[in-house]
């Protein structure tokens, strides 16, 4: 860690907090960050040359692992023709067609550069289409760092233990209501009073930014019914879950049809990307075909499109998700047993290849449950696992990601490390 410590000290002189995204600083787990030099398959290597089994996967995009040959080949082929043109390319159509063919509810799609851009644009579209201002989100759900969505948010906001962010005007925050996740009755009560003023309900169909929290069936289905009743646009934020928990995202897993879907991470194959899509009647309201404006200098850039196309081709192969499910289940079952054998109160929450080990005595169904977890114990667990060569998200409120590159040996080594560390807690 000597080189990483040197790099962190150097970074702090020119980069706020020494990192370009807060959770990476590892402050909540009482240690300094690892600076990474390279990755290969399921492994990453820090600046000192130490190898780790990686369960961050760049926070979700790397479902195929690091430097997958098909993705690298596609990026190199695109790069040979130029980085970006500021004009349409065929690759944009190819990726859009792939997304529309895979994602059940998406009839048209617009490419952007990040998940934050996708959610901000989807909110604007919902407001423009309905003529309403109100937004409903859920405590602990994170939808990027747009002003109107930084209310009772998860991810780094939860990790830092802050309710929102200075710099968000009260008038902006007032237009957003944050309700309890998995509580459909709270949504119904709210909409009785303000449903006719609400433009959109946005939700992570599987919460992944307060740790992994699965939706109750009556909650996710109930949102669709409430939105239909009041003419509200239902937005599923599938930036994390899209192409991750199932090929067709969480919407295919739970059988719910949103009006709009936001996407990112996996569809960029590790390059910066985002997208939002949905019903043709809504999407045609976006400029230049409609009055709702949205634009981006690097939107649809060739390298990200090429990486996304290659990734979607790989994950569409027969048996891909079955194999990923098997690895993820083996890891979850092993962690559950290791915690029980060590006498440590813990809950494993998993949907597909996303999972979290909560240091909690009972089930975690919402943000209040997540906040009751033993954060000190998680910090010790994180530090111990990192020392054993296992790279986990440095926050109790983040998801672990299993990739197709994780082997049986990787899972076995991870569980062996977990058994050792859990016994020491």
Swiss-Prot record:
Provide the coiled-coil residue spans.
none
Q: Name the domain of life.
A: Bacteria
Q: Fetch the Pfam families from UniProt.
A: Aminotran_3 (PF00202)
Enzyme Commission number(s) of this protein? 5.4.3.8
Q: Which PROSITE patterns does the UniProt record give?
A: AA_TRANSFER_CLASS_3
Please write the reaction equations for the catalytic activity of this protein: (S)-4-amino-5-oxopentanoate = 5-aminolevulinate
Q: State the family it belongs to.
A: Belongs to the class-III pyridoxal-phosphate-dependent aminotransferase family. HemL subfamily.
- The name under which this protein is listed is Glutamate-1-semialdehyde 2,1-aminomutase
Q: Which organism is it from?
A: Desulfatibacillum aliphaticivorans
């Amino acid at each position: 860690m000597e080189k990483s410590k040197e790099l962190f000290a150097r970074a702090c002189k020119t980069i706020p907090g020494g990192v370009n995204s807060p959770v990476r600083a590892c402050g909540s787990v009482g240690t300094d960050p690892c600076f990474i030099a390279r990755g290969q398959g399921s492994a990453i290597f820090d600046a000192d040359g130490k190898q780790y089994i990686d369960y961050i996967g760049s926070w979700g995009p790397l479902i195929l692992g690091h430097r997958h040959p098909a993705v690298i080949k596609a990026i190199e082929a695109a790069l040979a023709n130029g980085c970006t043109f500021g004009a349409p390319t065929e690759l944009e159509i190819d990726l859009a067609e792939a997304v529309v063919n895979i994602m059940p509810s998406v009839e048209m799609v617009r490419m952007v550069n990040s998940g934050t851009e996708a959610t901000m644009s989807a909110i604007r579209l919902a407001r423009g289409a309905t003529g309403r201002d109100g937004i409903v989100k859920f405590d602990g759900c994170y939808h990027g760092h747009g002003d109107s969505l930084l209310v009772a948010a998860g991810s780094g906001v939860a990790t830092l233990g802050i309710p929102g962010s200075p710099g968000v005007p009260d008038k902006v925050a007032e237009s957003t209501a944050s309700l309890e996740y998995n509580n459909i009755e709270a949504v119904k009560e709210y909409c009785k009073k303000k449903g006719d003023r609400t433009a959109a309900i946005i939700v992570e169909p599987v919460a992944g930014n307060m740790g992994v929290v699965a939706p109750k069936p009556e909650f996710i289905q109930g949102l669709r019914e409430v939105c239909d009743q009041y003419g509200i646009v239902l937005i599923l934020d599938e930036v994390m879950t899209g192409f991750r928990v199932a090929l067709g995202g969480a919407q295919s897993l739970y059988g719910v049809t949103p009006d709009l879907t936001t996407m990112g991470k996996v569809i960029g194959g590790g390059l910066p990307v985002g997208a939002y899509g949905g019903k043709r009647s809504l999407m045609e309201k976006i400029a230049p075909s409609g009055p709702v404006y949205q634009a981006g200098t690097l939107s649809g850039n060739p390298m990200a499109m090429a990486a996304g196309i290659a990734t979607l081709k790989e994950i569409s192969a027969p048996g891909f998700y079955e194999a990923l499910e098997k690895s993820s289940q083996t890891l979850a079952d092993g962690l559950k047993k290791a915690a029980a054998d060590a006498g440590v109160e813990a809950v494993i929450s998993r949907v597909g290849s996303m999972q979290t080990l909560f240091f909690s005595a009972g089930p975690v169904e919402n943000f209040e449950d997540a906040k009751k977890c033993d954060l000190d114990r998680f910090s010790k667990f994180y530090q111990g696992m990192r020392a054993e060569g296992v790279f986990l998200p440095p926050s109790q409120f983040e998801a672990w990601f299993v990739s197709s590159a994780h082997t049986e040996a990787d899972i076995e080594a991870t569980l062996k490390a977990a058994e050792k560390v859990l016994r020491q807690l």
